[in-house]
C-alpha cells in the first residue's frame, strides 16, 4: 500500500477560519459536540444551533477539511486573554496567576473536536487502490488514529500561527488520558495546576510553542502551511458549506 498518498498533507487541509462563514462552521460543530453528543451544554441556550461564548470574540479559529470531499472534519480555537484572564482560569482550577508580561504572549487552546466520519473520508476518493482487508490494517485503521492525525494537524497550524504572531506559550486543559497521549507523541507537556470539581479530571497544562515546533513529528508529515479561508473565498466566490457529521471525539475547554 502506498502510505504516502494517505498522509495528512495528501488527505487534508487546514484553514484559518477568518470569515463569518467558517467561524459559523466551528460554532455549529461545537453545538453538535457539546449540546447534542456530549450534553455538556444546554442546547436551549443556543436556539441558532451555534455553540459559542464571549471568548470567541478574542479567539482565532482553525478548521480541517478533507481535500477530496470538502467535508469539514474538525476544529480548534486559540483564545487571547481578556483582562489578564483565560477561560480556564474562570473554571475554578487551582492555577498560579501569570505575570502581566506572560499574558501578552500566551494563549489558551480549547474547543478541539473531530467528527466521526474522519476515518471514512480518509480513504475515500484518493488515488490509492486498496482492498477491504487493506482498509482494516491501514495506519488510518480506526477513529482513534484519525483523531490523533487531525489533532496534530490542528496543533501544527496553531503553532505556526503562534510563532508568526509572537505567541510563545500555550495553556490548555487535559484529562489524564489526553495528557498521556500528547506526551507519548513527544510533546513537552507540563502540568501547572490542579483540577476543580467543576472540571472533573481536567487539569491545566503548559506547552512551549518553540518546543512544539521542534517535535520530530513534523519531519515526516504535516508540512503544508495552513491557508486563510478568505483567500479561497476570493478565488472561488462564496462556497456552500457542507453539513458537518456526527461528532465522536471532543476535548473541551
Located regions from the model:
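Short amphipathic alpha-helix that is part of the acyltransferase structural core
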Residues: 2-50, 61-63, 72
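Short acidic/polar alpha-helix capping motifs at helix-coil junctions
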Residues: 11-15, 24-28, 141-145, 155-157, ...
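Generic structural motif
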Residues: 19, 67, 81, 117, ...
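Secondary-structure boundary elements
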Residues: 22, 36, 66-70, 160-169
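Conserved donor-binding loop and adjoining core beta-sheet/short helix segment
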Residues: 44-101, 107-114
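Acyl-donor binding region in acyl/amide transferases
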Residues: 83-189, 193-208
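Accessory, usually C-terminal, subdomains that scaffold auxiliary metal cofactors
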Residues: 188-245
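Charge-patterned, long linear interaction tracts outside catalytic cores
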Residues: 247-253
Amino acid at each position: 500500500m502506498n502510505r504516502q498518498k494517505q498522509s495528512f498533507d495528501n488527505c487534508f487541509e487546514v484553514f484559518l477560519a477568518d470569515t463569518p462563514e467558517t467561524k459559523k462552521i466551528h460554532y455549529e460543530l461545537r453545538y453538535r459536540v457539546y449540546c447534542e453528543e456530549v450534553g455538556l451544554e444546554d442546547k436551549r441556550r443556543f436556539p441558532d444551533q451555534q455553540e459559542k461564548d464571549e471568548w470567541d470574540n478574542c479567539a482565532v479559529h482553525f478548521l480541517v477539511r478533507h481535500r477530496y470531499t470538502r467535508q469539514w472534519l474538525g476544529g480548534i480555537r486559540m483564545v487571547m486573554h481578556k483582562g489578564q484572564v483565560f477561560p480556564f482560569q474562570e473554571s475554578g482550577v487551582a492555577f498560579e496567576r501569570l505575570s502581566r508580561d506572560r499574558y501578552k504572549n500566551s494563549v489558551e487552546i480549547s474547543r478541539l473536536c473531530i467528527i466521526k466520519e474522519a476515518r471514512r473520508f480518509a480513504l475515500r476518493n484518493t488515488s490509492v487502490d486498496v482492498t477491504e482487508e487493506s482498509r482494516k490494517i491501514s495506519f488510518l485503521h480506526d477513529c482513534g488514529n484519525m483523531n490523533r492525525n487531525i489533532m496534530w494537524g490542528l496543533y501544527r497550524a496553531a503553532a505556526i500561527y503562534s510563532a508568526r504572531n509572537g505567541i510563545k506559550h500555550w495553556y490548555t486543559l487535559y484529562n489524564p488520558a489526553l495528557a498521556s497521549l500528547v506526551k507519548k507523541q513527544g510533546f513537552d507537556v507540563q502540568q501547572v495546576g490542579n483540577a476543580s470539581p467543576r472540571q472533573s479530571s481536567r487539569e491545566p497544562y503548559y506547552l512551549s510553542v518553540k518546543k512544539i515546533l521542534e517535535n520530530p513529528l513534523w519531519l515526516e508529515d504535516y508540512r503544508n502551511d495552513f491557508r486563510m479561508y478568505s483567500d479561497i473565498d476570493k478565488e472561488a466566490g462564496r462556497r456552500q458549506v457542507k453539513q458537518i457529521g456526527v461528532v465522536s471525539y471532543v476535548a473541551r475547554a
